[in-house]
Every structure is written in structure tokens, then in C-alpha cells.
């Protein structure tokens, strides 16, 4: 039986096609070296000509244009841009300038508390329970201590720029949630948490 099996294997082995020998990689000339232009993708650090994205897709978060810092959305973040002597303007999303220039008389008395609540949002308030606890200890004791960070982020704390980027992402997310919550409470009549 072993002879029969070995015979079948030998016939199958011998009837198999011979694979071509591996070819060495082609020699790359200096003309073939990259980087090749990719017209559909943004270039890192280059300002886009499209005025809607404000360079958000092509820049890391710590190099975003000064539109957010000039409008006071992130007062705790220091910008690398030179300070402007012009009076900061109220923040508005691109394309919404004309809607905000409506006369003040159109705003009803019922909408005024919501507008005040939106203007008084705590942009630098703690975003997590561990930050809230630390903030109350700071207020009660009167001494300034460094904020605690979640244990899951401790291995990443030594990377330069990671903490700043993460904090920026959390602040923007909190701001977006707060604005959406204020809109929902006005529409649905829900109470703010």
C-alpha cells in the first residue's frame, strides 16, 4: 500500500508544472523615484484652495488655521500665530455669515436664555469625571495641582503633541455636543443635564 501511495505522489510531483525562477527586482533609475503627485489627496501642511475645509484635512490639529483661536473657542490653547490687534469676532461656520446678520428684533424672548446659555458655555471646563473630581479638590484646597488623566492614556502621555491633540479633540467634541444639546433642548423642550 505504501508503494502505491508513493507511486501516486511521485506521478503527481512529476506532472506538476515547473514554476519559473524568481526574478530579481527591477533596477530603479533616478527618474522612477517618488514621491509622485497625487492630485486627489491634500498635501500635509499645505493650505487647501477650497475655502470650506480651512485646511482641516491637510494639517495636524496643533497647526490648524487660527480661526478657532481667534474666535475664542479654545482659550487654553496657545497658538503659534502672532496675536492680532483686531477685536475678535464672534465665531461662525463658513457660509453662515448672512444668516447671523439678521436684525435683533427677530429673536424672541423665549430664545434669549438659550442664546445666553450658549455664550456662557464653559469651553475649558472638565470633560470627564476624573477631571471634575480634581477640579473640586483644587477649588476647596486653594492650591493648584496638575490635572489627572485617565489611566488608559498614561502610556501615551510621553509622546510629544499627543496630549495636546487629544485635549483639542475632546474640547471640540464637547463644544459640538453642547451646541447640539442646546438646540435639542430648545426644539424638544428637554432640560440641560
From Swiss-Prot:
Residues 78-111 are annotated as: Disordered. Residues 78-87 have a biased composition (Polar residues). InterPro entries: ANXA2R. Widely expressed. Highly expressed in lymphocytes. Expressed in both resting CD4(+) and CD8(+) T-cells. Disulfide bonds: none annotated. The keyword Transmembrane helix does not apply. Keywords: Receptor. One of its GO terms (molecular function) is signaling receptor activity. May act as a receptor for annexin II on marrow stromal cells to induce osteoclast formation. This is Annexin-2 receptor. It comes from Homo sapiens (Human). The lineage of its organism: Eukaryota, Metazoa, Chordata, Craniata, Vertebrata.
Amino acid at each position: 500500500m505504501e508503494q502505491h501511495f508513493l507511486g501516486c505522489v511521485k506521478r503527481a510531483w512529476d506532472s506538476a508544472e515547473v514554476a519559473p525562477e524568481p526574478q530579481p527586482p527591477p533596477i530603479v533609475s533616478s527618474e522612477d523615484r517618488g514621491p509622485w503627485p497625487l492630485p486627489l489627496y491634500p498635501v500635509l501642511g499645505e493650505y487647501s484652495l477650497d475655502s470650506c475645509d480651512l485646511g482641516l484635512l491637510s494639517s495636524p490639529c496643533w497647526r490648524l488655521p487660527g480661526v478657532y483661536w481667534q474666535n475664542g473657542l479654545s482659550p487654553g490653547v496657545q497658538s503659534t500665530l502672532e496675536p492680532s490687534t483686531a477685536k475678535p469676532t464672534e465665531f461662525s461656520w463658513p457660509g453662515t455669515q448672512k444668516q447671523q446678520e439678521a436684525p435683533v428684533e427677530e429673536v424672541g424672548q423665549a430664545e434669549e436664555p438659550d442664546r445666553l446659555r450658549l455664550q456662557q458655555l464653559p469651553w475649558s471646563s472638565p470633560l470627564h469625571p476624573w477631571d471634575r473630581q480634581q477640579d473640586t479638590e483644587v477649588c476647596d484646597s486653594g492650591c493648584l495641582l496638575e490635572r489627572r488623566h485617565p489611566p488608559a492614556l498614561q502610556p501615551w502621555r510621553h509622546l510629544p503633541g499627543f496630549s495636546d491633540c487629544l485635549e483639542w479633540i475632546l474640547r471640540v467634541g464637547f463644544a459640538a455636543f453642547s451646541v447640539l444639546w442646546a438646540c435639542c433642548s430648545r426644539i424638544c423642550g428637554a432640560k440641560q443635564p
